[in-house]
Amino acid sequence: MTSEQVRGAIRAFVTQNSEHTWSGRAVARIFHGIASPNFPAKQWGRVRSAWRSHLDVDFNLLVRMATQEVLSLRRGRYSIFL
């Protein structure tokens, strides 16, 4: 999977779940299937399109990419209605 495909998946995920305030680390944790108190596996494991969907991408790289995309969305660089 290319970095642009991963970035597209990040943007789609964040916009589809815009009721949450996302950080790059939170998105990366979902994409790697790592539960947290705010994003428990019991709830987010049902989101098959995202949970554990990018295990092939280095976690720290995914955090950096997700942080960049989340900030871009917040700044209005992308339309919230993709």
Which residues does each predicted region cover?
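Accessory DNA-binding and partner-docking regions appended to nucleic-acid-acting proteins
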Residues: 1-82
